[in-house]
């Protein structure tokens, strides 16, 4: 997977890279109380979420769906599907995020 350089334009507590290869990227993301991953989508890659501390919420548009993940639960968001990630009731949360396969991008959605 080719990665385009990017800078987060939103606050999170931490992001730890577990591995990054030519076609896959895996991070552990930690968000504090009230923090979130804003609405966005990816052109080619699938986001696979595994909740490590929660509960956490993954919301999608088209199709509109809400996934409430407890520790150990997972869900996938395919390419071109806008999604938003936050803690249930704005609580702190932590998740493993596996991304692939394809060129990484992050396209904000209002």
Where are the model-predicted features located?
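A short, N-terminal "cap"/entry segment at the start of jelly-roll beta-barrel domains
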Residues: 1-27, 38-39, 108-110
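Short acidic-glycine-tyrosine-enriched beta hairpin
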Residues: 63-79
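A short hydrophobic beta-strand segment most commonly corresponding to one strand
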Residues: 48, 91-106
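Histidine-centered divalent metal-coordination motifs
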Residues: 40-42, 83
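Structural motif
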Residues: 55-57, 82, 92
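Short, conserved beta-strand element in jelly-roll/cupin
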Residues: 31, 43-58, 98
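Asparagine-centered strand-capping/turn motif at beta-strand->loop junctions
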Residues: 85-88
């Amino acid at each position: 997977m080719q990665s385009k350089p990017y800078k987060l334009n939103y606050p999170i507590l931490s992001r730890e890279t577990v591995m990054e290869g030519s076609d896959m990227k895996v991070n552990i993301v930690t968000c504090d109380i009230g923090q979130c991953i804003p609405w966005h989508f990816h052109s080619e890659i699938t986001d696979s979420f595994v909740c490590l501390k929660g509960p956490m919420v993954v919301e999608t548009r088209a199709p509109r769906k809400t996934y409430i993940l407890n520790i150990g639960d997972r869900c996938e968001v395919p390419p071109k599907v806008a999604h938003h990630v936050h803690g249930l009731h704005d609580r702190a949360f932590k998740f493993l995020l596996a991304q692939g396969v394809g060129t990484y991008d992050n396209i904000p959605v209002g």
